[in-house]
Amino acid sequence: MTDYTPDETPGIALRDISKVYSSRTGDVVAVHALTLAVRSGEFFSLLGPSGCGKTTTLRMIAGFEEPTTGRILLEGRDVTDVPPHRRDVNMVFQNYALFPHLTVWENVAFGPKRKKLPREEIRRRVGEALELVDLVGREKRRPDELSGGQQQRVALARALVNRPRALLLDEPLGALDLKLRQAMQLELKRIQREAGVTFVYVTHDQGEALTMSDRIAVMNAGRVEQLGTPREIYETPSTPFVAGFIGTSNVISAPLARIEGAIALLATSADERVLVPLRVPVPPGASISATVRPEKIRLSLHPPDGDRCRLLGVVREVVYLGTATQYVVATSVAEQLVVYAQNDGTADLVPAPGDRIWLWWRPEHGYQLIHADATDVPEEAAP
């Protein structure tokens, strides 16, 4: 899977890299043959559940793991056999590994000092790095005198002061509380944009990936299921796994009734109507799976007019979420469809459990899934 034109040199290029671990019980494939390109200056995220191969991929880029097959290129230079300290990349971990006995300034200056840069150059670089991460004025503090977010920024400054071609981040926000984590997401994106450095960010948190990334590779079982922008990944998931892992998604499966141009009409009861724009051809009588996001569905006491998709259902659960109310509705094509209704004070319909209700949405808000087996959605993707 490549995503760059021939005249471009990607910041990081992975060419058919794989990683196989051997043991007495047999081989374990952590990463299957993987080819992708990260553009220079891009904020690129590897997103997926535990055990999907994202951290192994990052460690192969860093040089901490040797790929079983394939090549790794950094700005056109093959670094597959180059040791980590000579790859011109730096890595930031969830455990920031700051030196507790050194001040902020001394922690950040550690790398340039090891490179034996001139004293004035060290002073200039450290000053620029501290200004970039908004730590000017805290140079003399030690790590135990800093908050978790400040410690994280010290780790970033220490990595960026060496001016790497790429910065690799392995779930660096995982140890922070929710509010601080959300604030640091915006900070990380600002720092990346101002530094102009390629970021490769590993996370299992879909919110982090959607908030910060220019592009996301969604990984599952050692493979990339989908590569795209946050909007593409969320609005047009390619597989049931991606649909289930990114946000909350409803998967609808039903036999094909007929095709009208590029639109499939699914087999439902006479009063119901489900239309799905086709991405790939479907043979007559085949089952089609499609996804529609909960916020795209509307509720009504009566079937809507026109060509809107519509299903009759029974409300099973009503959950107040603050900004929205979640309705779980049983229908003929899905045991449960989730609907989000915004609590903006304009709703004239407030269904209760047991009520019969119509659900409707625009056909263009449904998206055909390539793999029809909806059971591919993992349990850990549940909201």
From Swiss-Prot:
Protein name in the entry: Spermidine/putrescine import ATP-binding protein PotA
Assigned keywords, A-Z: ATP-binding, Cell membrane, Membrane, Nucleotide-binding, Translocase, Transport
Enzyme class: translocase
UniProt key word Transport: yes
Membrane topology: Peripheral membrane protein
Compartment list: Cell membrane
GO molecular-function term, one example from the UniProt record: ATP binding
Family listed: Belongs to the ABC transporter superfamily. Spermidine/putrescine importer (TC 3.A.1.11.1) family.
Entry EC number(s): 7.6.2.11
PANTHER family: SPERMIDINE/PUTRESCINE IMPORT ATP-BINDING PROTEIN POTA, SPERMIDINE_PUTRESCINE IMPORT ATP-BINDING PROTEIN POTA
Major place of residence: membrane
Domain ABC transporter: 12-246
Function: Part of the ABC transporter complex PotABCD involved in spermidine/putrescine import. Responsible for energy coupling to the transport system.
Gene Ontology terms: cellular component: ATP-binding cassette (ABC) transporter complex
PROSITE patterns referenced in this protein's UniProt entry, alphabetically: ABC_TRANSPORTER_1, ABC_TRANSPORTER_2, POTA
Subunit text: The complex is composed of two ATP-binding proteins (PotA), two transmembrane proteins (PotB and PotC) and a solute-binding protein (PotD).
Catalytic reaction(s) noted: ATP + H2O + polyamine-[polyamine-binding protein]Side 1 = ADP + phosphate + polyamineSide 2 + [polyamine-binding protein]Side 1
Binding site for ATP: G48, P49, S50, G51, C52, G53, K54, T55
Top-level taxon of the source organism: Bacteria
SMART domains (UniProt xref): AAA
